[in-house]
Amino acid sequence: MILQIDENAEEIYFPDPHYGDEDGCFAVGGDLSIDRLLLAYSNGIFPWYSFRDQPEILWFCPMKRFVIFPDEIHVSHSMRTLLRKNRYSVGINEDFDAVIRACSKTNGRYEEEGAWLGENIIQAFTALHEQGFAASVEVWDNETGELVGGLYGVTIGKVFIGESMFSKVPSGSKIALIFLARYLQEHGGKMIDCQLETPHLKSMGGRYISYEEYMEIMNED
């Protein structure tokens, strides 16, 4: 059941996500304000646009969550070889705007190229970033200085919720994800929420957990 959010309500709220459809969609409407996004992500909820049949924001909260635990990240032999070559440098929050705009120009989790990541969404996540609730990882080519890969997402407590990634070179986004996992290990991060399963993420250690386990980790001190 997908319920309409009452935009005239005195307080920001979401319906109970347990009654969503099989894909996890349970609500429509609302906005991308910082307060609503923080309420959403702290409860395992994320926004999604479907321009084909629904111009409003769709809100998803799957009861099975595809995640990567930082200490379970799988680094293949070929990736280890690539990383040892020191061809790329990796940083965090060095150019959030460049990363999110690069993601908007690639086919991500939606079919419409770039359409899902319009200027309104870029502005919303940039606002989260400016408040310390969104972060980016950048992969730079050491020879050319070009940004060749990266990812961005929302940070809530010890959880990183991945939103999108891009790669202009083979394995560029994998390098970013490996760096993120190692960074979280060093700084007490507990989990990377991948949102959707892909062969790419599964090969790197992604697996499903229940929504209940997800929220237990989300609420850890």
Predicted regions and their residues:
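N-acyltransferase acceptor-side catalytic subdomain
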Residues: 1-221
